[in-house]
Amino acid sequence: EPLLEILQRDDLAVTLLLFFSGLFTPCVRISADFLQVQDAYLQSETAAKGITDIVDLTPIRDMYSGGFYPFATPEEHWAYWSRYIYINRYMDAPKPVYDDLLKLVADKDYFVITTNIDHCFQKAGFDKKRLFYTQGDYGLFQCSEPCCQETFDNEKTVRAMVEAQGFTVADGVLTPPTDGTPTMAVPSELLPGCPHCGRPMTMNLRCDDKFAEDEGWHAAAERYENFLRTRDGQKLLFLELGVGYNTPVIIKYPFLRMTAGNPKATYACINMGQASTLREIEERSILIDGDITAVIEEMKKTASYK
């Protein structure tokens, strides 16, 4: 209730962070003869069917760790990654939490900074000019070198890759072939190459010092910094959802630091098992140790927008 009361104030700027670590994107774990979703947060039959054949042929047991698997050929590498990208970037989130979050902040002066790379915020209708995806975008390729700081839309290529493996795409849903298993390789002619230097392309994901920060990335970073700069000292809610300690220096630590430096700011954290704050700002912190979906759903029942 205290968090909802703050969100419903008329004089509030809201900085909203969302980092779902496998909570709402189909990060599926396969075990025994049943589908067991990673951390038990969602049932995603479509995602599970999308990698069942890979599970049978490799040690891969969930989609995230599969991203680090050393596939034998580029054709096999892109067979896996095309499915991963399509499921996590181009399919809708399996729960309406993004839509509910938008309803909570739509009439506020908000900004979203996220380390998610699935663009669920944008698909839910959040203002693109109020979003900063710090770690990249599943929907973009970049040069693996990189020879430039450009990125390239990949939806057409990714769709061609999954269809070449036998999947069908209808109404945004990826469906495995009904007669047999998918082909665990893509045609060589579909392998993406940099249009400038010819080197292999890779995903635009921040995993090393070769991450390409294109013009769009820098424009979003500047808008975020301007948002913070022009609201300095105002009533702010730093709402942190699902952030762990994998990369706390990007969002968690700055949110805590900015709350400590602004006596009019409130820090709110919803996190299963990791809701914590600094001792110096305990009186201006709201900590909810619980499932984000359940908390947002409860707020939805009470909020005036329902």
Functional labels for PLM-detected ranges:
Residues 1-306:
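Conserved catalytic alpha/beta core of Sir2/sirtuin-type deacylases, generalized to analogous enzyme cores
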